Amino acid sequence: MKTITPDTTTTTSSQHQQLLIPQADQHHQPMLQQQSLLAAPPPTMIMEHVNLVDDDEKDPLALEQLEVSPSTKHTHSLRRHLPRIIVKPIPPEKKPMAPSEEAAVSTAPAPPTRLICSRRIQQQQQVKAAAAAAAAAAAAAAAAAAAAQAQATSSYPSAISPGSKAGTSQASTMREVLASIPGFSVKPRRRSNKKLTTAAQIEQTKDGKIDLETPDSILASTNLRALLNKQTFSLLPPLYQYNLIQLLPSVDREASELEQPSSSASGGSPSEAIRLSASCLNNEFFARACLEWRERLSEGEFTPENQLKLKTEAEREKNKLDPWKLKHFEPFWGEKNSRGKDKDKLESDCKNQKLSASIKSEPKPPATSQQKPLQQATCDNETELKFDLSTKCETTSAKTTVAVAVADKSSTFPPTGSQNNVLNEQQRRVLKRPSSSPSQRKQAPTTIATINLDDDLDELPSTSKDSKQPKMDEIVPNASGNVVAAPMVDVVDHSAVEMKIKDEQQHQRQHQPLINSTCDKIEPSECSKEMIVAMKQVDSKEDVDSIASAAAMPAIAAVTPHTPKPEALAPNPDVANQFVSYLQNVELAAETKAPLDNSNEADITTGTNSHDFVFSDTIDHAYFQEHQSTINHNFFTSSSSSNTATTAANKLEEHSDKPEDSPLPIASSISGSTPASSITSTSCTSSSSSSASMSSSCSSSNSGSTTTAPTTSSSAGAPTAPLTLAAAAETTLANVQAMLSTVAKLQQQQQELPVELNSNEMYQHVQHDWNFGDIKLSSSQSSGDQQRNLSHEAIDLMDVVQDADVIDDIMHNDVCHDVLGDEDEGDQEEDEDDEVVECMTEEQQLIDEDSEAVREIVDKLQQHQQQQNQQQHHQQLHIQDVVQLAQHSFMPQAHSEFGNDIGQEMLCDAVPMSAAEMEVSSTVITNSSNSNDSSNNISLCSSTNSLTINQMPHQASQQPQQNAQSNAQQQRQILVDSNGQIIGNFLLQQQRQQQQQQLLQQFTLQAAAAQQQQQQQQQHQQQQQQQQQATSSNSLGKTLPVALRNGTQQFLSPNLIAQQHQQQQQQQLEQHQQQATAQQKHQQIQQFALQQAQLHQRQLLAQAANNNLLQQQQQQQQNVALPTTQAKFIAKPLNIISMTRPANASPTTAATTANTASIPSAYANVVAVTGAQQQQSPPVPAPQQQTVQQQQLANHNSNMQQLPNVLTMKTLPPSGVPTTIAQQRLQPKMPTGKGRKATSNRLPPGAVNLERSYQICQAVIQNSPNRENLKAQLRPPAAILNQHQPTTTTAPAPINPVTLNVSTVAATPMSNITTATGSMAAAVAAAPPQNVLKQEELLVSGAVGAGALPAGLPPNVMGVGRPGVYKVIGPRMSGFPRKKYVQRKPSPTTLIRHVFSPGPGGATATAQQLQMLQQHHQSTTSPVPVQNPQQPAPEQLIHQNGNGQYVLVHRANVGAADNQAPRASSAPPMHQNQFVTVQNPLHSINGIPMGGRGRPASVDTTAGSGNVIAPPISATDALHHHHHEMQQQQQHQQPQPLGNVGAAANIVRRNIAAGPNIAYIDGSNTNSSAVALMEAGNNYIVTTNASPTAAPSPINQQPQSQPTGTQHQHPLLQLHQTGENTPPGNEATATANNCACSLNAMVICQQCGAFCHDDCIGAAKLCVACVIR
């Protein structure tokens, strides 16, 4: 093939180039560049081509590299990714024949590398036959060559030729292009060392020779703009002019293109039509392109040597890329848009190449059988095209061809309007992105629709990729919609064969009606979506044709698969029928819409289609038209919904593929539906469809993704429709339909690949979403009542729709969630769907037919799903149950309410849903790290839910109760992120509701831990029944996670409620302790089960175990304190542990250091239940804590914490949270020790100002062309998140958090824990120890504990922000070296030992005298001593961004050193005693003699420093450290319930090189450790300097329960309160269980002689203390 890649005009040419470029990279890259390079000078382009010609052997990448620099500035893409224009080498004879782009595309076959060379040649011939498009392509190629030649004669023409050459995919192709230019020599000139004089070079130009490569070229010193002007340009042959104009940005060639299409259509010379705009060659962009090209030429960039070098570098870089990331993310910055478009088009072309024979044949009936437009739909999604080409080529291609044909038809109709040109531009961009190149292609032949269709069909077979792109480009520019109508019919008849002919006929009918603004009738037929779009567009105006072409083309790309698919599906009759029926259904809905608002629908359709495409591409919002912009932002807002929706879309696709009958009934019923209702349904579908497009792109692995595109197109028609009044009701129907179809399909998929496949797809979707800013909007929408409404909207869509597009988006998300859930649980889904349909129909009250159709579909889907779901349900019962929480967390609150009905469906969906939602939750975790990031927004989108996931266990139960009780009862507090994103919605709920929710959570976890759950259920079954009432237990399970996701948390005045609850909690603490032991036993059982489970199941089970723990904790909370309300916190899945300032330092910040401990994330609430019922009623618990603390204060010195407890209600002010670990260290007034400078105000050597760094990164990213991708990777410092999460600070309860600690261990998100007591954090950390799948995959304990992340989530899902990944400082301590992380991975066990030392409540902690002593010492020490331990912990807190804005980069990479408090490398060696003293004033204060224990001071010191952080941190550590540690951490969690938050909990996190990651937690300072949350992954002991005071009674009860729980949980987990870290000699009893490695032999430190466990000591045989030195 001949490829001309304009150097400067790459962006312009890239549009065509994309179509021509077969390589995926080339596809994406050229598109951006085309768009970016607005004014690339054609001559420059030619020059690049010439240079490329010399580098014939060079890879197209190299050519791209050459061209990139000018385009980079314009497109912000790397040079090596410049788009290429592949011009088929048309002999001079052919050149006039093939002026159209299609010809150029078809001529692309020249490169032998392409598989379809022969096909392309055939296509070229076909293109000749269909001279219009082919002529345009040939003209482009010829124009480039002619320009090059003309320029060759004069240096100016040569400049042009290199530009065209730049697009060459291969040197040979470029040679052909240049060789085709008369008198232009492409022969590689002998490179002589002699430098030709200017005169000599000018003389050579007469022979057609010009140097386009070396810096010696005369062009390097020539003013290109003097050469490239209208006068010289007019000297070129018309064909050359036309082709060169194609390289210019659309703005500079619109007028000419409008005329050109007619000429192309007529096949006449395009010269007559070619008229450059006044400023096309005289503008800053063109001038810059000329200058850049000259600079690159003078720099020697185009020399063969440099080209080869650039090529190798590009290949080397590409080889470094992770295939998964390469699939879902642009490999290079700035490459996303252009390359995404190119890839989409190219991939679609690749698929179309397979389909091309059929598609081409389409215009020519023979090809119809091979039509596989599905690939076009797949094409819509970049990722799908890339990776699914091989897997989905058959299915996709079959569908794609139809889509192409339909697109051609629909696009053909619309081209008539003048708007068509404008819309075409937008569509071009949009379509390029969504790789709806077929649609654009269809439109591309601006001359006549007939030609367009033929060209498209021809191009698809010849070079589906290449031809597609040029067609799209041309189609967009060309607006000859009127002519298109008739030709469309002809083309359609050829291409469509049976179905397509019908479609075309329908389209023809539509086209006329469209023109006449009566497109409804035709649309319902096979091309429903495209037709609908076109019809709507036509209805608005005849110009709507342009809109239709723009909107219809996207719709065609996305939706076309349905209608054309019947034809294309001929090979796949089932799929074809299904898609056709589905399309018909959609069409009917769209059809109905069109009558309602012709103008509105047209506008809406256009916006929707573009939006859908954008969605599938996940690239540009800007391309949307005005309506699109208004609505698309909302949809983008629901981009998160697209995550879920993506799954839904996938399901829809598969459903449409598999269940033919259900889609058809939908179609019939829909057609009957009223236009208004259909509009609404379309509107509903549109957001879901956009998500579907996303899903298809993300889940291209799923064969059904093509179907998703159709869904998108149909819904695309109505995205604006929801704005119309009738839209609401209809939207629900559309959503239901989409959900049903999606469910049916997804269920099948899930059966095939129940967990991993979906999770991978989900991950892809999620990451795509991360790239989108839309999620942010969605999250805000999802938060608060809107979220509920949205969930209801999924069911009761109508109510919310009128409220706002945001609601629609959320509705779509909910629907997607529902669909996901439906997929997973077909049986449950049946009920859910029926209910949804019923609710929707009732609420809509628009059309009973719609509801009936939906019901029919639902029934069929239910039947189909029931079969699949039954299988999946039995197979994945435990996993699903585990996943249920995560899924529910993703479900909106309204959905959770509705989840009462839908619960089982959601549960069944849990596995696939969990995969998808896990992605979201992982995203959420990332979000928690950086709420500002788009990824954070994404998680918020689908997840306010995901945020809630952490809270899920506790909140989920609460929300179902709330839902059951009434929305009115719920009082919402919406947390807003620093970005203004809604972090979460907090519902003020009575403890009873919370308890009920907890029961629900427990119920959900039953499958994972049947016995434990059964007991819990028995305990709370009545409450659950009350809550559930009408809802099934499964729905309850769903509801619980949903409620948790909703982040329903109460912020009650801690002072009032806390005192009341304090007594109750104290009384109940004993019960909780008893329960805790039983629960711990259950947890152990669950943990073992999790360990045994498969890796993915392990993750799910681990989540389930965490949920169980949470539920148990919640139960304990309920039992302990049935206080009116629990403090609910939106637990962002932030893995970041925020350290709260010592209560003394900033009571508000400490918010109750003790209370903080009690405040976990979602889990924190659960923990609160266990630790002190106070959390259940956060305000009460905080006061209770205060009361207890006051009592303790009487007993102890820590009165400070009482104030913080009261303050706990307040979120930590940004200033309140210590911005740096150093600050935290400074806060502890206690002397840390001899060697420590922790008290100094100076920051530690590795300290990083996270907030400032984050701001800098934000600014850099904002200015980066790759901002979409980068935003997802940037995670806000936990301090920022905490500051903006008042709920997190809510210090729900309380110091009693001993229970809190337990639940926290299960799954308290670190970020939430930050506010919550350290015990909460510890619980979170501990929860995931056994999720072995991949410790990374667990995504940090926070996520797992939250259960927000599906076990199946690959570690990559978290992306950079994932806590498990050290790239991100976020949840994991960046200080933690990856090496260590790797080391940790091997270690499956992370033991968090909680030394229960009720400091303030020491008197109460009679159960354990040591704990009491420790607590007394702690209280004596006051929070400050705790803080000192924290200071040591800060090093470990490095990873915890939560409270400190400064992250300490861990300096010591020694495995053992991780647990030690950071020490200057120059610090003198410390004796064990010294180390204890220094690191743990708490230990000595707590009465735990560090040195006396006989263990290396480093071990105890670690614990000591951890004391402040106490259990919460340790649990958190375990979680973050290793998801696999979860079980142990869970075990620890219950020990953590050490009642005394006030007592500094010593958390010693030890990274054992041997592999088991052991987190040592001394529970002595639980209260002070409120802030001391530690990510397990951090290995850092985070001790908060919260006052050790804690309610004495809770402390006593907690310590008792904890030890019991510890014993039950694990011998290792059993921590003697005082003896956890004590050396074996000191406490014989405790020693065995104290250390995670206590079972291992003791080794003497080579340096200080301290006894250390073999696992605790590194290879150097040095204790932690010595290692630090």
From Swiss-Prot:
Sequence motif: NEF motif, positions: 283-285
InterPro entries: ASX-like_PHD, ASX/ASX-like, ASX_DEUBAD_dom, DEUBAD_dom
Keywords associated with the record: Chromatin regulator, Chromosome, Developmental protein, Metal-binding, Nucleus, Repeat, Repressor, Transcription, Transcription regulation, Zinc, Zinc-finger
Signal peptide: none
Residues in DEUBAD domain copies: 215-338
UniProt record similarity statement: Belongs to the Asx family.
Record protein name field: Polycomb group protein Asx
Protein's organism: Drosophila melanogaster
Gene from which the chain derives: Asx
